[in-house]
Structure formats: structure tokens, C-alpha cells
Amino acid sequence: MTAPADLSPTLQLACDLIRRPSVTPVDADCQTVMMQRLGDAGFKLEPMRIEDVDNFWATHGTTDGPVLCFAGHTDVVPTGPLQNWQNDPFDALIDEHGMLCGRGAADMKGSLAAMLVAAERFVADHPDHKGSVAFLITSDEEGPAHHGTKAVVERLAARNERLDWCIVGEPSSTTLVGDVVKNGRRGSLGATLTVRGKQGHVAYPHLAKNPIHLAAPALAELAAEHWDHGNDFFPPTSFQISNLNAGTGATNVIPGDLVAVFNFRFSTESTVEGLQQRVADILDRHELDWHVDWALSGLPFLTEPGALLDAVSSSIKSVTGRETKASTSGGTSDGRFIATLGTQVVELGPVNATIHQVNERILASDLDVLTEIYYQTLVKLLA
């Protein structure tokens, strides 16, 4: 069934946002809707269009106190085959089981609606609150992420903008809303390795140098290496080869080079420079003719127990009756950019079981629970 007009304010807004087909990096006026609501609530608005990406920064309050920022993204991933969806992915239907169905329901238009409604209610209830409530919203999280949160954070840093705490609305929950929050993420370091040999005929190997044979022992050593032991907050650093390419397509030609693409997901126990040096040492030990192009997607970050994590955890407990688990598992998020400001960052959002899948859906009532958790967190930190 379609969403009726008597839905809660959070669900009404979530449905409105989902019905806007904002496939990355297109915003489809989602931010226009959000800024209109925030402006009406008394927020100062600062749109930031950077290249082809829409972003905005909004604040309510004073500059002489702590800043709690809600961060998120209006862009969604492509739908995939439409014929595999039970309904149009941008219809925002609530089915007979009470599930809100649509692209972005979990990732992360539901969170956007919940944080906005919570903030509206908070500034109405506490117009003279401490510090500031802020929003940092982008339409470039699911794509390259060059001109979104990263670029906005650089602008905020350049003018010494204060940002003490940040709640990112990523879908952190696994089974029940609030059962897991992310208090950090591993770093991501990618690499493209080229091992050079000498092309030749397979019948005359003495006249060639086979880069596959040369590289195989080194790749095996890299895959078997224990990079670190992790710590109380992070698992050990992982190394994975994702692509391996060599050969001309002919069966009688020894290739001239081999290209391997690999990735580290690394903990705070390792550094970029340390990992790069250890890779170089292994490759040199095997006497390879090699070159690596490195690509750092983000450094690891960690928010240890403190004001933000305590406020979020106690709010989840008071609203749901459940203890939450703090975790650093999963991929990267825009939290990695915000953490560079020295900000305490926690990710809290809906259940993530169907994110990026066809028939993405969440329990509709979870968004009202999430709204209350966000509201209680605001009260604990800024009232």
C-alpha cells in the first residue's frame, strides 16, 4: 500500500525523499526539501555546490559552545534490474508487513528524515540550547566522494569551524535498530602492482622472463603475511588481491607483464608508510622488476568511550531498553573525512540487511524509534 497522509512526520519526510530518484551524484532536490525545513526551523543555511555535487552546511545556535553535527548523504546507488523489484524502487511503499520499501530507505534517506525531525523538535523545545546543532549533507557518498563531505570538511577546516561531535546516519544496525553503532572504521589502502618480465614464445622460455612465475611467490608471501594483531577495537589488518591480469590471450605467448590489484583494510596498529615499506621489502626480496601505484581511500579512525558514545548508548538504552554494541567492522564511510578534524564520530542508523540490494526495505516504525534516539542524544549533549 502507499504511505497514507497520517504517517508520522519522520515517515512522511522519508517517503518524500525516497520518491526523489537521486542516483549518485544527482540530488533530485532532496537537499532543497531539507534546507527548506531547516530554514523554517531557524537554521542558517550554506549551500555548497562543488563541481557537479550538491552539498550543504546548516547550523542552529551559538559559536561559543560544543557543536553536534548530523552528517549524511542524499544520493543512492543504482536500482539494478527494475524487473527484480516487487514495486517501483522510488514509490516509497509501506507493505502489509509494515516494511518501508524503496531505494534509500535504509541507506540513508530514512536516517536523514529521522535526524531532521529530531533536530526540528529539539530546537523548538530548547530554543536557547548550548552550542550548535549542525547538518553536513552531500550527494556524493555512493560515488567517487571527491567533491562531497571531503571537500566540505576541507572548507570547514580552512575557516577553523568547530565540530566536536558527529552522528553519521549510516545504517549501522544489524537486527534491531540501535543494536550496533560504529565508533570507528578501518583504513583503506589500495594498490596496483605491475611486475615487468619479458615477452616471448612459450617454447623458448630461456629467451623470455615470465612475470607470472616471477610474481607468484611474492604474491603468496604477501597473502600469507600477518600485518598486525589488531587491538581491542580493530581486527587484524587484512590484505586481499581483487584482480590479477596477465597474458595476451594467445596460448603460446609468455606475457611481458603482470598487473595485480590489492587492498589493505588496516587498523590503527598499522600505518600507510609501514605497509608500503613492508610490501616493497617483500617485492625486493624476490628480486622483481616492479612498480606500485598507491591509492589511500581513508585512514582508520576511532571514537573511544566519551561524551558522544556515552550519550548515544544511553539514549538507545532509554528508548529501546537494549544495550548497544560499538563496532568498527564494515567498509569506509564519510566519517573518515570528518574524523580528520579531531571530531568524535559515531555512526547510527537503521538495519542494514538489504542495503544496495533490490527490494531495499526497513521496518517503517524503526524510523520513529531512530528519531527518538537522535532527539534524546541532542538533549543529553546540548539541552
Curated annotation (Swiss-Prot):
Its cofactor is Zn(2+); Co(2+). The active site is at residues 75, 141. Coiled coil: none annotated. It is an enzyme of class 3 (hydrolase). Binds 2 Zn(2+) or Co(2+) ions per subunit. One of its GO terms (molecular function) is acetylornithine deacetylase activity. It comes from the Bacteria. Pathway: Amino-acid biosynthesis; L-lysine biosynthesis via DAP pathway; LL-2,6-diaminopimelate from (S)-tetrahydrodipicolinate (succinylase route): step 3/3. It catalyses: N-succinyl-(2S,6S)-2,6-diaminopimelate + H2O = (2S,6S)-2,6-diaminopimelate + succinate. CDD domains: M20_DapE_proteobac. Keywords: Amino-acid biosynthesis, Cobalt, Diaminopimelate biosynthesis, Hydrolase, Lysine biosynthesis, Metal-binding, Zinc. Zn(2+) 1 binds at residues 73, 107, 170. PROSITE patterns: ARGE_DAPE_CPG2_2. Zn(2+) 2 binds at residues 107, 142, 356. InterPro entries: ArgE/DapE_CS (IPR001261), Bact_exopeptidase_dim_dom (IPR036264), DapE_proteobac (IPR005941), Peptidase_M20 (IPR002933), Peptidase_M20_dimer (IPR011650), Peptidase_M20A (IPR050072). GO terms for biological process: diaminopimelate biosynthetic process; L-arginine biosynthetic process; lysine biosynthetic process via diaminopimelate. Belongs to the peptidase M20A family. DapE subfamily. Catalyzes the hydrolysis of N-succinyl-L,L-diaminopimelic acid (SDAP), forming succinate and LL-2,6-diaminopimelate (DAP), an intermediate involved in the bacterial biosynthesis of lysine and meso-diaminopimelic acid, an essential component of bacterial cell walls. Homodimer. NCBIfam families: dapE_proteo, PRK13009.1. This is Succinyl-diaminopimelate desuccinylase. It comes from Pseudomonas syringae pv. syringae (strain B728a). The lineage of its organism: Bacteria, Pseudomonadati, Pseudomonadota, Gammaproteobacteria, Pseudomonadales.
